[in-house]
Amino acid sequence: NSEGLAEGIETRELPPYEDNPNIGDKGWRKLSLFNEKLADLEGTALFLDLDIVIRSDLTPFFEAEGEFLIVKDWDFPDDIIGNSSVFRFEVGKHPDVLENFYKLGNEIRHDYKNEQAFLSYEMDRKGILKYWSSDWCVSFKRNCLQPFPLNFFLMPKDPENAKIIVFHGRPTPEQAYKGFMGKGGLRYVKPTKWLDKYYQ
């Protein structure tokens, strides 16, 4: 749905995707980006989730060496799983990723927590899994929030060297800007007013 987008943003139809209601909504539709054809696009593509905040120029994300790069997931430091909020891939080069997803069918939910786990293991199997520099893409929850109880008194930190701030789960960027109280009251987020610098 392209309604409400700012003038000048070009859109394309989403690629075909065979929905499987038995595996739940874990972002699996992202895998449709690995169709052999992706609208009229070709070459290198950078995927960005909508619930991120861009702090600086994205050019380095296109200059980094590697065929497939993704954020190293903060929740799985001892696993190869990436966070698919920000990843780069070559359009049309990996249709087998989508094909393997379809082949697994309902079994996929037993072997993989979500789409980013499956994607990471597929790219590792192909020998091309690489991660962005850890200071490029940071987690708002892990890297910006003040530790308890300082979070009740101090605004979250603006990560000086980060290029992208990833908001996975709660709070969303909008919730963080206004202030947010998580379940149990411990994960309180003071209104994060410096976010407006990146929403010009």
Predicted regions: what they are:
Residues 1-42:
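Active-site-proximal specificity loops/subdomain of glycosyltransferases
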Residues 1-6, 54-59, 135-136, 170-171:
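Short, polar loop motifs at secondary-structure junctions
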Residues 45:
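Short aromatic/hydrophobic "clamp" motif used to bind/position activated sugar donors
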Residues 95-200:
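Catalytic core and acceptor-binding pocket of nucleotide-sugar-dependent glycosyltransferases
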Residues 85-92:
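Short glycine- and hydrophobic/aromatic-rich loop-to-beta-strand nucleating segment
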Residues 52-83:
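Conserved donor-nucleotide/metal-binding helix-loop-beta segment in metal-dependent transferases, i.e.
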Residues 48:
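Catalytic metal- and UDP-sugar-binding loop of GT-A-like glycosyltransferases, i.e.
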